[in-house]
Design a protein with these regions (language model features):
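General beta-strand structural signal in soluble alpha/beta enzymes
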Residues: 4-6, 32-33, 61-65, 84-87, ...
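Conserved active-site segment immediately N-terminal to the catalytic lysine
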Residues: 77-89
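Active-site C-terminal subdomain of aminotransferase-like
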Residues: 89-172
Length: 174
């Protein structure tokens, strides 16, 4: 797999104009990026990046939201994000061990055309198993119960209230 990094200074976010220049210079299939980098507190301007990606309709977006999922608004469908990945750790404040994802129909269609997808992270395999009420592998049942508890806490607080609380906490430390 060939990958071309878009280098930025440590702690700086991706400049959407730099991304546009890079995408215009080649034949790209996918853009992957970390939305929020916890080690330095940098958050990429995701909406503006997605605005750029709309100009390149053949490019699929895969966004790591492990430390931003549920704490800032990420309107996946409105912004045209193809794949959101997160984990149970960090923003969901759970032990590590669960991978969570949301996949657009466009990304599913791209996966159908992709040979050698493997098994472990094959979204098509997950979708097929989900349709049968199954999982593709042995699930970590205690973490699924913990996720249910965590999601209920988020819904009880209210998603918008959670976003506002995290924004207030962010302002206290920055």
């Amino acid at each position: 797999i060939q990958a071309d990094p878009l280098q930025v200074e440590w702690g700086q976010h991706i400049d959407p104009d730099d991304l546009k220049t890079q995408l215009a210079s080649g034949d790209y299939d996918v853009v992957t990026l970390v939305h929020n980098e916890t080690s330095c507190g940098m958050m990429n301007p995701l909406k503006e990046i997605m605005d750029v990606l709309r100009e390149f309709p053949d490019v699929i977006s895969i966004i790591d939201t492990v430390s931003s999922f549920s704490v800032v608004p990420i309107p996946k469908d409105d912004w045209g994000i193809d794949v959101i990945l997160t984990g149970s750790q960090k923003a969901l404040a759970m032990p590590p061990g669960l991978a969570l994802f949301s996949v657009s129909e466009r990304a599913f269609q791209r996966a159908v055309q992709t040979e050698g997808r493997g098994y472990y992270f094959d979204f098509l395999e997950f979708r097929s198993n989900h349709a049968k009420g199954m999982t593709p592998s042995t699930p970590v049942i205690p973490l699924i119960h913990a996720l249910n508890y965590t999601l209920n806490k988020i819904f009880d607080e209210g998603v918008e209230n959670r976003h506002q609380r995290h924004s207030r906490l962010n302002q206290l430390v920055h």
